[in-house]
Amino acid sequence: MAPQLNIGMVGLDTSHCLAFTRILNDRRDEYHISGAEVVAAYPGGSESFSHSRNRVQGFTQQMGDEYGVQIYDDIATLTRHVDAILLESVDGRQHLEQFEQLAIGKPVYIDKPLATTTADAYALVDIAAQTGTPIMSCSALRYAA
């Protein structure tokens, strides 16, 4: 049996964090993907964005209670416990700042939006190249069943 891929998640302010965790962690889910599990998360959140501010606490609670995900207080600690990262923050204005902390050579999936400005998108790609960090960004609907 291949070793499990331990995934960390940054940004627990979107329903996507629960959807991805369910298909990776819940073996009973009809779309379960074996071989990987979300094991660690950093809540993040954006006080200036109501879609984030109003949801981060509840989603963080669910991640820990329903899926046993270890919640960390900072990104650096999270990265030491995982093999790959899902950057899920709903407020795309935070993606560049968060990615700067995540760019340590481990693969990072950046949920939509990749960035909110062209300059930030180019900066993300430059940082990924400089640090040897593989990145991917897309809408999850592209892969929906």
Where do the protein language model's features map onto the residues?
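A contiguous active-site-proximal alpha/beta segment in oxidoreductase catalytic domains
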Residues: 115-145
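Hydrophobic residues in well-ordered beta-strands that form the structural core
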Residues: 73, 110, 135-137
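Proline- and acidic/polar-enriched loop/turn elements at helix boundaries
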Residues: 76, 91, 113-114, 140
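Conserved short-loop catalytic and cofactor-binding motifs
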Residues: 8, 112, 138
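N-terminal glycine-/serine-/threonine-rich beta1-alpha1-beta2 phosphate-ribose binding loop
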Residues: 1-104, 121-122, 130-131
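Short helix/strand-capping hinge loops at secondary-structure junctions
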Residues: 107, 112-113
